Amino acid sequence: MNFLKLVIQKKKKKMIDETQKIHGSKIEIFATCVRVPVFVGHAESIFIETKKKIDLKKLIVKIKSFSGLSLVDKKIDGGYVTPDESAGEDEVFISRMRIKNDFNIGLWVVADNLRKGAALNSIQIGEALIKKFLK
């Protein structure tokens, strides 16, 4: 096995393990990892299957209510955010939301991995805990 295949397999396993750590081990994940030459950013094409019907309007309102998430919902060519465009931003950008049927949705998600990662997440979690429990 060559080095690149080994790295990609480890990244795929890490993606699955971290998602299951957050959402529980029962969540099924079909992951594909690809290394592409970008200066900054992580990008994910996410396909979600739900047990309940998806109300796209409610989902859009909910996403827009979260600080740190930015929805780019343009139904035109180029109406999505690229990793390069996320550079220098703290937000996680969601675009290309599309419903396959009432129970499946696809998303394109990008973020600047140098800004939005474990360090910033830790600060934001700490701020939220202080706001909730110490004020």
Task: Put a short name on every predicted segment.
Residues I29-F30, V72-K75:
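Flexible, glycine/charged-enriched surface loops at secondary-structure junctions
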Residues M1-K62:
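Active-site-lining helix/loop region of Rossmann-like oxidoreductase modules
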Residues K74-P83:
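Glycine-rich active-site loop/lid that clamps phosphate-bearing ligands
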Residues K5, V36-G41, L71-D73, I94-I99, ...:
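Generic structural "secondary-structure junction" signal
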Residues E49-K51, K64, T82-K135:
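C-terminal helical cap and adjacent loop that interface with cofactors, partners, or active-site loops
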Residues K58, I63-V72:
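A common structural junction motif
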